[in-house]
Amino acid sequence: MTTIGENKLTEMPAKIQKGVYAELPKLLEYVKAGAIEKEMGVSSGWISMRLNRTQNGKYSVRKFNAADMAKLNSAIWKLAEKLMVVNVPYSPDRATCSAYVKISLKDVFVSVLAENKLGWTKTELAYRTSTGASMKYRPQFTEEDLEKLTIGVRELAVRMMSYEYFLDQE
């Protein structure tokens, strides 16, 4: 019996093979690979092992096969569905906002989202959701920030769903 992931890519049409290696890295700029792997129930590094190229430019021996793609697409879709229901309520209490953002985005933390949608630096979202004695001196979430964050999360969900759609096309 062959372990999932060990088969050659010949089980999948060429267009889907090309799509996996072209589109998945783009998606991983927005979504942590660990979040997808956790949803799939596979070990950490499972995705990167299959995306890495060898020195001669070819992909490593362990590649995606049809069974891998089914699990991968299912996991991405489930994460996208979770993101579609994220709606961050505004509260003057910064700790409440921070806690809600952490809980809502703990599975899919996206620093690029903060950069693109909120105009913050890469670490700003983490900075605003951190806790500690100096919390009161840190930047506060504004109602506008949280509205942009909610919109950004939903746009990310659409991106994830369209990834699966792309791979399903013949």
Where are the model-predicted features located?
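A short, Lys/Arg-rich alpha-helix, primarily the initiator
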Residues: 2-33, 77, 85-109
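Short, charged/polar micro-motifs that form catalytic or ligand-binding hotspots
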Residues: 26, 37, 62, 103, ...
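DNA major-groove recognition helix of helix-turn-helix/homeodomain DNA-binding modules
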Residues: 62-83, 139-161
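Short alpha-helical "recognition helix" segments of helix-turn-helix
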Residues: 32-40, 108-118
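Short, charged recognition helix plus adjacent turn
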Residues: 10, 55, 81-103, 107, ...
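Recognition helix of helix-turn-helix/homeodomain-like DNA-binding domains
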Residues: 43-64, 121-141
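Secondary-structure boundary/capping signal
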Residues: 32, 44, 80, 121-122, ...
